[in-house]
Amino acid sequence: MKIQILLFALVLIFVEANAATQGKNTTIPALIVFGDSIMDTGNNNNLPTLLKCNFPPYGKDYPGGFATGRFSDGRVPSDLIAEKLGLAKTLPAYMNPYLKPEDLLKGVTFASGGTGYDPLTAKIMSVISVWDQLINFKEYISKIKRHFGEEKAKDILEHSFFLVVSSSNDLAHTYLAQTHRYDRTSYANFLADSAVHFVRELHKLGARKIGVFSAVPVGCVPLQRTVFGGFFTRGCNQPLNNMAKQFNARLSPALDSLDKELDGVILYINVYDTLFDMIQHPKKYGFEVADRGCCGKGLLAISYLCNSLNPFTCSNSSAYIFWDSYHPSERAYQVIVDNLLDKYLSKVY
């Protein structure tokens, strides 16, 4: 009898442990992403914009070697995070005309390369503003309700991980068109306030687990070094990095306050320090080159300037932190995701 009781207890423990594991694996039904080229997996492909990359050598390290509209040699963080969450190896672009209803269930990215928190940024670049991405998100939820029911839509809204990634294009480009209205500090503050407003609006639509990326050290991307870093030294554009830091200094406490005010979880995700350390100490992370991109000569090549006619593209992109003159390589993205995701997800789930 004692043996039977012991066996029954062991079975119960096994079932409970297995259920807990199953629950943990199914906690996150989808990944929903908003933002710019860092997270764009092809939303710009059919837009009337010059900011496209659906041609070689973009995608040379993507599965099958296809150029999909991702601003990298391979996958981008939206893909890598989706994989790490156990959802899919790649995250589809919402604007993909071949997307089927079932493709929506594990999440999508609404991100559009070249956009920003400043509405002027998307207008200048002829891309999808973050505010229009919210409109697309409303449409997405309507589709989920129509095809899979109210309960599934509720599950996605309440339990999915929502990511917001923007600010680089505002800081690096649009500010130059806004100097008559803002100095550097006030513009960075305006962007941070816009980011908080965006998160508030996303929360109103039902999102409850939201992570917001900090600005990155955009003054250290190869293009900024080439144009503003000095002909011989090609150092980082420090005034631009200072603007990014000001944006972060404003954004972080504002999101903390919002997290206390609203139900759910709202996280500030510090990407700046990790990427800056990678750029300053590339060998520590297994990289050889940090001040040039792999594509072309790595100084100015981006979008159509990074093309298959350029004979200087490197053969080993994994040795480079940057793929083109503005965007990291897949391997650099992987390092960032591996360094940050578990740390921050533990605060959400």
Swiss-Prot record:
It is found in: Secreted. Keywords: Glycoprotein, Hydrolase, Lipid degradation, Lipid metabolism, Secreted, Signal. Pfam families: Lipase_GDSL (PF00657). The keyword Nuclease does not apply. Glycans are attached at residues 25, 316. InterPro entries: GDSL (IPR001087), GDSL_lipolytic_enzyme (IPR050592), Lipase_GDSL_AS (IPR008265), SGNH_hydro_sf (IPR036514), SGNH_plant_lipase-like (IPR035669). GO terms for cellular component: extracellular region. The active site is at 37 (nucleophile), 324, 327. GO terms for molecular function: lipase activity. CDD domains: SGNH_plant_lipase_like. Its EC number is 3.1.1.-. GO terms for biological process: lipid catabolic process. It comes from the Eukaryota. Residues 1-19 form the signal peptide. Belongs to the 'GDSL' lipolytic enzyme family. This is GDSL esterase/lipase At1g59030. It comes from Arabidopsis thaliana.
